[in-house]
């Protein structure tokens, strides 16, 4: 069985290997050394992308024991992967040969019974190996390990589920039985996607109104050495500036004729805290008219102090292709995107610009479709009737229709280097909880805080899609209603947030 410190080293550097490993070359060597067999090779080669192949190789090595770790290190050195070999060097030792009986193979239960300690006549003792490897670590690697240890020691606290959490999720056996509601219960969204209970976080109450606010201790950080090892300018956007960039949040809550967007304050507080932790300077604007939204975004785009990236978050009512101001005047979303192009935002030319839109895009409601939950299926979060509201003008059966023939901004083509994350698909409503905020923003904060350290933004938003689609639902009469976010990406490279704790990283 592979030592835990070695498993951890491979796990936390999985992003490095997935970007720089030559899978075909390494796979041949590992098969020749009898670390992997032909069946393993078939599984790896069946992966859809090169990056998935690289990850599968690392996972296969993890499953094959300590001898596989050392053979993997030797293979990296022999094939010219010197940078990757340096990652493993502190815990590695070279070997001259291996035999199948030295491997741990989870596909063959008998191999577990045959596993044994390495013969002293062949290798030095495990204690000696560990001591020698530590003494050979360079000062750079030692500092990196210190930083990582400190980061882990200050990670978020965990707590078990309490009775007050029960209305937030249901088991597969009673997935359509609503539970009593309590505005004072804590949201534990990670349980809905099957995350380990040790990763479950609690959301603090910021006021008597039970706003569940994201805090800095909820963020998983990455350290500077990892960032610079991973970065590839040909395939990744730069995102190293201090601050990372500017973030504008437009939060429309009170409208002239449309209903108040209860719960949007929780969205604003959560998303602003999230991006502050990621290194952005956040500016919030509340209750803007249609014209004021355009002028504010125009000024934001022309700002002279932009960093390596920019973020725009819009929390409002909406319809398909439009955002509605507090004066009930609608603004075409494509006009907003046009303000962010290179001509109107020269400081942001060739830089990633991320737009998050929490608003309805129509009046349709997604009734979902029945699926049979397996034993480890994803439980859904049941919202009591009357708590979840839509962000569309025709919500609640035309009870708050705005006047027609309002001004609509012209549509213009959007440009490259822009990513738009919509809370819902075109023509459908999006849902918002009056205490916890919208489903979409809750999921963004949960997923980004956990995985922004090693996932690019497209991967992150795919996880958000999964969390909203599988982890939330509400009821309207006898109908169970669902929501599906949508991602539109015009990025030309991968974009990583790489949230960096400046206090700990300064020691590197």
Swiss-Prot record:
PROSITE patterns: CARD, CASPASE_CYS, CASPASE_HIS, CASPASE_P10, CASPASE_P20. Residues 1-223 form a propeptide. The keyword Hydrolase applies. Its main location: nucleus. Residues 2-91 form the CARD domain. One of its GO terms (cellular component) is presynapse. Residues 106-130, 148-184 are annotated as: Disordered. The keyword Membrane applies. Residues 392-407 are annotated as: Required for interaction with ced-4. One of its GO terms (biological process) is regulation of cell adhesion. Gene3D superfamilies: 3.40.50.1460, Death Domain, Fas (1.10.533.10). Residues 171-184 have a biased composition (Low complexity). Keywords: Apoptosis, Autocatalytic cleavage, Cytoplasm, Hydrolase, Membrane, Mitochondrion, Nucleus, Protease, Synapse, Thiol protease, Zymogen. Residues 118-127 have a biased composition (Polar residues). It comes from the Eukaryota. SUPFAM superfamilies: Caspase-like, DEATH domain. Acts as a cysteine protease in controlling programmed cell death (apoptosis) by proteolytically activating or inactivating a wide range of substrates. Component of the egl-1, ced-9, ced-4 and ced-3 apoptotic signaling cascade required for the initiation of programmed cell death in cells fated to die during embryonic and postembryonic development. During oogenesis, required for germline apoptosis downstream of ced-9 and ced-4 but independently of egl-1. The CARD domain is involved in ced-4 binding. The active form is probably a heterodimer of the p17 subunit with either the p15 or p13 subunit which are all derived from the precursor by autocatalysis. Interacts with octameric ced-4 (two ced-3 zymogens per one ced-4 octamer); the interaction causes the autoproteolytic cleavage and activation of ced-3. Processed ced-3 also interacts with ced-4 octamer to form a stable holoenzyme. Interacts (via large subunit p17) with csp-3; the interaction prevents ced-3 autoactivation and delays ced-4-induced ced-3 processing. This is Cell death protein 3. It comes from Caenorhabditis remanei (Caenorhabditis vulgaris).
């Amino acid at each position: 069985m592979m030592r835990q410190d070695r498993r951890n080293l491979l796990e936390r550097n999985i992003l490095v290997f997935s970007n720089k490993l030559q899978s075909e070359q390494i796979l041949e060597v590992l098969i020749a050394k009898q670390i992997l067999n032909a069946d393993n090779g078939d599984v790896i080669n069946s992966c859809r992308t090169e990056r998935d192949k690289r990850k599968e190789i690392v996972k296969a090595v993890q499953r094959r024991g300590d001898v596989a770790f050392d053979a993997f290190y030797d293979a990296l050195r022999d094939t010219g992967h010197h940078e990757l070999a340096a990652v493993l060097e502190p815990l590695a030792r070279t070997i001259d040969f291996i035999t199948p009986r030295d491997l741990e193979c989870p596909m063959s239960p008998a191999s577990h019974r045959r596993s044994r300690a390495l013969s002293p006549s062949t290798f030095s003792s495990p204690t000696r190996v560990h001591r020698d490897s530590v003494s050979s670590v360079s000062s750079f690697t030692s500092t990196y390990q210190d930083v990582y240890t400190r980061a882990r020691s200050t990670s978020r606290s965990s707590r078990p589920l309490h009775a007050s959490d029960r209305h937030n999720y249901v088991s597969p056996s009673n997935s359509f039985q609503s539970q009593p509601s309590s505005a004072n219960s804590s949201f534990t969204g990670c349980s809905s996607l099957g995350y380990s209970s040790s990763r479950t976080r609690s959301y603090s109450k910021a006021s008597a109104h039970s706003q569940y606010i994201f805090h800095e201790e909820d963020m998983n950080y990455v350290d500077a050495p990892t960032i610079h090892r991973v970065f590839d300018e040909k395939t990744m956007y730069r995102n190293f500036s201090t601050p990372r960039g500017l973030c504008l949040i437009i939060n429309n809550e009170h409208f002239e004729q449309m209903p108040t967007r209860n719960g949007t304050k929780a969205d604003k507080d959560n998303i602003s805290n999230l991006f502050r932790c990621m290194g952005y300077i956040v500016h919030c604007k509340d209750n803007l008219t249609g014209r004021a939204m355009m002028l504010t975004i125009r000024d934001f785009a022309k700002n002279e102090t932009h960093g390596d990236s920019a973020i725009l978050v819009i929390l409002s009512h909406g319809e398909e292709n439009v955002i509605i101001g507090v004066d009930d005047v609608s603004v075409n979303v494509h006009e907003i995107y046009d303000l962010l192009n290179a001509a109107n935002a020269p400081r942001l030319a060739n830089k990633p610009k991320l737009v998050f839109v929490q608003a309805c895009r129509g009046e349709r409601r997604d009734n979902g479709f029945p699926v049979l939950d397996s034993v480890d299926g994803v439980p859904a979060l049941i919202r009591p009737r009357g708590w979840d509201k839509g962000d569309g003008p025709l919500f609640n059966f035309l009870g708050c229709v705005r006047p027609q023939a309002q001004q609509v901004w012209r549509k213009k083509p959007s440009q490259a280097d822009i990513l738009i994350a919509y809370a819902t698909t075109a023509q459908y409503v999006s849902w918002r909880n009056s205490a916890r905020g919208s489903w979409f923003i809750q999921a963004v904060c949960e997923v980004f805080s956990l995985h922004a350290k090693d996932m690019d933004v497209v991967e992150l938003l795919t996880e958000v899609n999964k969390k909203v689609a599988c982890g939330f639902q509400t009821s309207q009469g006898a109908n169970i209603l669902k929501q599906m976010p949508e991602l539109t990406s015009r990025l030309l490279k991968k974009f990583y947030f790489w949230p960096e704790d400046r206090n700990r990283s300064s020691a590197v």
